[in-house]
């Protein structure tokens, strides 16, 4: 199996450039992974496909102000995206433009020094006056939006590129599967006996990096910090014991849970779980925790598409994607959603 096996043609007009006028009004394609059969519904009707005793897992990470422009002394503009502490290193930025070690940049009257180029468009910066780089971004930067939207961030993005339950600052991209979740829908789920719990995974560098190799074995996933409270772990155990299903809202939740479940003490620990998830999930992977997955329609050749294929089955997923394109579903972050039902 090769990366090219997960390629498909995504028409440009299928990409949702803006959020829907009202949160929660998007469409929902429901896929049965056992048969490959599909059903067409609405995100607001999610409760119709779940049952009392099920548990919905949400990522409560909050998108931070991380995108800022600086200029070189030549006048050239450089786009900077602040990354969270990554593999033990702080003050990393993803940059667009040409930089080398020793370059000096000006951003909002502050001088920044390029301390190191770490590769793949990533640099380590410092402020010349010794001030804190994250605080500089918090004062002057904007909430980043995905580059495939092909537009500048607007006022609407400050609210809509954030979930209604975002609490823990740290992501440079939203956990998009729950962008359409509303307080009303969460209340409806609760009334029907469907519980919710949260994990935190700060979406980071890997979201913006393409797969540049053809062989899965050669691709290296970047690490993303996650934390799972013990009360969430306890709810998962109780749900499983009671015959309920664990429904992951998004690939970020899935990666956090499945990485944590790889720990030898997952089944017995009475403490929170945390770490840096570098798990690469693709077809052939055996899921340990999740029983259903609510997710967006993903870009071709992406790691999140491969994770979704691992859960749904590659042919099932690609057939459903072709059907979604035929029926004019909207793709990517601000688009429609897919529910892969429990088998």
Curated annotation (Swiss-Prot):
Pathway noted in the entry: tRNA modification; tRNA-queuosine biosynthesis
Biological processes annotated in GO: queuosine biosynthetic process; tRNA wobble guanine modification
Pfam families noted in UniProt: Queuosine_synth
Subcellular location: Cytoplasm
GO molecular function per UniProt: S-adenosylmethionine:tRNA ribosyltransferase-isomerase activity
Keywords assigned: Cytoplasm, Queuosine biosynthesis, S-adenosyl-L-methionine, Transferase
Record's keyword annotation contains Translocase: no
Gene Ontology CC: one annotated term: cytoplasm
EC number in record: 2.4.99.17
Reactions that this protein is recorded to catalyse: 7-aminomethyl-7-carbaguanosine(34) in tRNA + S-adenosyl-L-methionine = epoxyqueuosine(34) in tRNA + adenine + L-methionine + 2 H(+)
Family of this protein: Belongs to the QueA family.
Quaternary data: Monomer.
Stored HAMAP family: QueA
Function: Transfers and isomerizes the ribose moiety from AdoMet to the 7-aminomethyl group of 7-deazaguanine (preQ1-tRNA) to give epoxyqueuosine (oQ-tRNA).
Identification of the protein by name: S-adenosylmethionine:tRNA ribosyltransferase-isomerase
Name of the gene encoding the protein in the UniProt record: queA
């Amino acid at each position: 199996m090769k990366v090219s096996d997960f390629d498909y043609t995504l028409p440009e007009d299928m990409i949702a450039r803006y959020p829907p006028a009202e949160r929660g009004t998007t469409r929902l394609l429901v896929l049965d992974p056992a048969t490959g059969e599909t059903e067409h519904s609405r995100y607001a009707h999610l409760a119709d496909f779940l049952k009392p005793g099920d548990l919905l897992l949400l990522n409560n990470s909050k998108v931070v102000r991380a995108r800022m422009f600086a200029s070189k002394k030549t006048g050239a503009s450089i786009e900077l995206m602040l990354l969270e502490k990554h593999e033990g290193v702080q003050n990393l930025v993803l940059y667009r433009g040409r930089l080398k070690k020793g370059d000096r940049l000006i951003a909002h009257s502050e001088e920044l020094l390029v301390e190191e180029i770490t590769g793949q468009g990533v640099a380590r910066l410092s402020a010349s006056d010794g001030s804190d780089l994250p605080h500089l971004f918090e004062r002057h930067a904007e909430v980043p939006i995905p580059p495939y939207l092909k537009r500048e961030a607007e006022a609407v993005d400050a609210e809509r590129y954030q979930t209604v339950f975002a609490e823990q600052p740290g992501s440079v991209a939203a956990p998009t599967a729950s962008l359409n979740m509303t307080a009303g829908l969460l209340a409806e789920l609760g009334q029907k006996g469907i519980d919710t719990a949260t994990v935190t995974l700060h979406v980071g560098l890997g979201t913006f990096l393409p797969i540049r190799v053809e062989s899965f074995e050669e691709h290296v996933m970047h690490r993303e910090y996650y934390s799972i409270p013990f009360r969430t772990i306890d709810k998962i155990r109780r749900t499983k014991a009671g015959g309920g299903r664990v429904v992951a809202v998004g690939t970020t939740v899935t990666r956090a849970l499945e990485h944590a479940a790889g720990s030898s003490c997952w089944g017995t620990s009475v403490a929170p779980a945390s770490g840096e998830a570098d798990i690469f999930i693709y077809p052939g992977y055996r899921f340990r925790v999740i029983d259903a997955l609510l997710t967006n329609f993903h870009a071709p050749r992406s790691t999140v598409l491969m994770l979704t294929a691992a859960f749904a089955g590659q042919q099932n997923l690609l057939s459903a994607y072709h059907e979604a394109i035929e029926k004019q579903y909207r793709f990517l972050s601000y688009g429609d959603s897919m529910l892969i039902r429990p088998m």
